[in-house]
Amino acid sequence: MAKGKRRGQPPKATDQELSVPKVPEDDGHLLLSFRHIQPRFGVDEMSERQRSEFLIKWAKRCGFTWTELGLHTKHGLGYEMLPRSQFKPTPPEALTEDKYMVFRHDANLPFAGFKAGDTFYVLWIETRYGDLYDHGKK
């Protein structure tokens, strides 16, 4: 036998909205996203060691602001900017950047992407030396 009475009150519209904490825009601390990672250059292609080194180095970078990170060397925790034309894979059509940021992970293998706000969007992670760009070019 079914009950005819409803229990409680239906939720109010404001109760259904998710509350997301606001992060100050000028905080300057690093965020990482794999939202735009490209096929053949993702985490699945990395060895266990490479994944570990990637996370360890990124965790160290998170202790700095973007400004502080810019003071580090490119083969340390810092980065360099490389022109779009230097990369072997073609960037997604929607991206119009002329240069991309390149960081290093395991044994100086690079990973590249772009920064929007405080978020770094990874496009490519190199797992074999020379797959992402010719390292002899400048």
Locate predicted features.
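Basic, Lys/Arg-enriched alpha-helical interface segments
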Residues: 1-107, 119-138
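Histidine-centered metal-chelating micro-motifs
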Residues: 109-111
